[in-house]
């Protein structure tokens, strides 16, 4: 059978702990996207660094295998909704951490109007009231694929699935008040 793989950290901590500009930027992002802690932000920053590192390596590489890997990277980023279909490898280098944070399930639930606030969106997800593609997802940091974006709804067994739920009525009124 073999031993299970060793669990590794999925994030890198900053190289210096007290750089004021970075701390201010992290505080703003943490508040804007209602992240639980900086570790969530660092996880997405590390993911972005990995995409950018691969893109830089592939820009310098030549050959058939490099071309295959270029296409795979661009397809992956397109599926995640981070890049358009006609994007070039240089576009990967211009991605920001906010682009990645915009693809989180928590952010998309809020933007779709299923929750009044981004914090409420997080709570709905963790409590199992949101499903993606018919599957309940309990991780607010789940990166939603482009084809799954339209399938984000309230879970069938959730009380929020009923149109007459009091909280849904409040959310609908808030939507109508924002449009007027």
UniProtKB/Swiss-Prot annotation:
Keywords: Ribonucleoprotein, Ribosomal protein, RNA-binding, rRNA-binding. Residues 103-165 form the S4 RNA-binding domain. InterPro entries: Ribosomal_uS4, Ribosomal_uS4_arc, Ribosomal_uS4_CS, Ribosomal_uS4_euk/arc, Ribosomal_uS4_N, S4_RNA-bd, S4_RNA-bd_sf. It comes from the Archaea. This is Small ribosomal subunit protein uS4. One of its GO terms (cellular component) is small ribosomal subunit. GO terms for molecular function: rRNA binding; structural constituent of ribosome. Gene3D superfamilies: RNA-binding S4 domain. One of the primary rRNA binding proteins, it binds directly to 16S rRNA where it nucleates assembly of the body of the 30S subunit. It holds the Pfam family S4. GO terms for biological process: ribosomal small subunit biogenesis; translation. It comes from Thermococcus gammatolerans (strain DSM 15229 / JCM 11827 / EJ3). Belongs to the universal ribosomal protein uS4 family. Part of the 30S ribosomal subunit. Contacts protein S5. The interaction surface between S4 and S5 is involved in control of translational fidelity.
